[in-house]
Amino acid sequence: KWILVCIYPKAICEMIDIIGIDKMGIMEVKDMLVHCENALNVLIDTSRLHYIRPILRNIISFKSRLGNNDDNINDYEEMLEAIEKLFDKFGHERELFEWYPYYVDCEFCCVNELIAERRCMTGISIEELAGDTQSSRNVQRIIKGYVSPSYNTSKKLLDRLGLKGVLRSDVIVGSGVEAYETLDKALDCIAMSKFEDAERLISQLRTMFYSNVEINNIVLEYLEIWLQMLKDEVEFSEVVNRLESLLPFKYSEIGKYKYLVKHERMILSTYIECLGKMEKYEAIPDYDKMTSWITNELSKKQFASIFEDLNMRYANSYGNAGHYEKSDRIAEEGIRIEIECERMHCLNTLLYCRAWNAGERGNVSENDKELCRCAYEIAKLKKQNIRMGLYRRWLEKQ
């Protein structure tokens, strides 16, 4: 689907532009409508906005051509109107010509720096890290960045630092692509509060993991803790303590380390969420400290999934604490990056946060209502019924 989402929506729209809708026969219209609907489903499955405007326009045109003027076509028209207004507001005039690596949330770091930082984090000596397979002198040169280690050398050093499998991982290390798809589905089910489905998928994951890879076991335990928290089966204070035990450093050291792996950032995000639910806003680590490793505009896109998630959680927490201006600034930045990267993972939450802040201040503008309407349309597109209800109730109050 990642390959499809980069190519399929754009390719379909370009073909339609070349052929021309007016020149298509009824059978061609039906075929291309199916392609457009499939392309839209790929965007929904991957939470992307790449070419969503022309896709929606074509679906509306094809349905009108076929005489399908029902409620279904109105849904597409409302979605298109909301997206166009949002893109216009943030100056996103045209679709990205193509996706460069940083738009696909491709994050890289120098393995030398990761090894050096982890050595400091764990307190292991150079001699212990070298073991009986490397010379201490060579390891020291690697840590200082004088030489680049081979894959095998990197693997051995990272194994000793508790990061076995990290060179192959994207959160987890699975035995095949099915494991990564199952993890994505489990996370989606949790987001949509489909807890029984999430538990079933997490059980399936256990059979797809390499159990001797430590990060896999950490991710499984994290998912179980997170699920218990969302189901109100455990106190937030207990969740905070259990999450800290999964990290290789203390909460007090947040901001000290730059190169964290994905599951560690996921754990920290849930930690922030817990503190917010406990209303311990003063204990939440400073936003600038949490994002100190994001040094420029490009790195915001390179680490888009992490950056958008942090912005969502901090915007919500600061808003709940009554720091509306700070919340607005963070939410606005998150929305901008989501739109520039044509993503919609956290977009509806960030949009609603801006509108909610305005409501709490008692000065809701038409622009705030438009933001919430767009949040509603995105939630509707992604079939997030609970969030749809939340956004609808807010709009009805205004």
What are these regions (language model features)?
Residues 2-19, 53-64, 176-185, 214-230, ...:
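Amphipathic alpha-helical repeat scaffolds of TPR domains
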Residues 1, 30-44, 80-88, 199-210, ...:
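Amphipathic alpha-helical segments of tetratricopeptide repeats
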Residues 44-47, 68-71, 103, 173-174, ...:
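Structural signature of alpha-solenoid helical repeat scaffolds
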Residues 22, 26-29, 69, 73, ...:
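TPR-repeat structural position
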Residues 121-141:
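Short alpha-helical DNA-recognition segment
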Residues 19-23, 66, 122, 192, ...:
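Structural motif corresponding to the intra-repeat A-B loop/turn of tetratricopeptide repeats
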Residues 150-169:
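DNA major-groove recognition helix of helix-turn-helix/homeodomain DNA-binding modules
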Residues 92-122:
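A short, Lys/Arg-rich alpha-helix, primarily the initiator
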